[in-house]
């Protein structure tokens, strides 16, 4: 049985954006996007969806440790957050006079890049 090959999703959320979680156990939290995973349609957000991992000692004499790190969230569970207006909004793509594409928040009209 053949499995479906993963497809790259065009994401409107980028690294460095401030986002708010809109679903799940961390609903309402905000943070900066550290990494996007377009092949999985997921994002890693700073301080959100934390997981603890036990790391074995790499060398003899070194002790093992417990590491807390961010796990990825599905991109549909986050919205871009305006820090000025304190509101989460969807993103639309607008084309300016020169033909360049820009991202704009639908609720506030704020340009992202």
From Swiss-Prot:
GO terms (BP aspect): translation
The keyword RNA-binding is annotated on this UniProt entry: yes
TM ranges: none
This protein's record includes keyword Ribonucleoprotein: yes
Quaternary structure, from the entry: Part of the 50S ribosomal subunit.
GO cellular component: ribonucleoprotein complex; ribosome
SUPFAM superfamilies: Translation proteins SH3-like domain
Family stated for the protein in its record: Belongs to the universal ribosomal protein uL24 family.
Protein name: Large ribosomal subunit protein uL24
InterPro entries reported in the protein's UniProt record: KOW, Rib_uL2_dom2, Ribosomal_uL24, Ribosomal_uL24_CS, Ribosomal_uL24_KOW, Translation_prot_SH3-like_sf
Gene name in the database record: rplX
Region forming the signal peptide: none
Gene3D superfamilies, alphabetized: 2.30.30.30
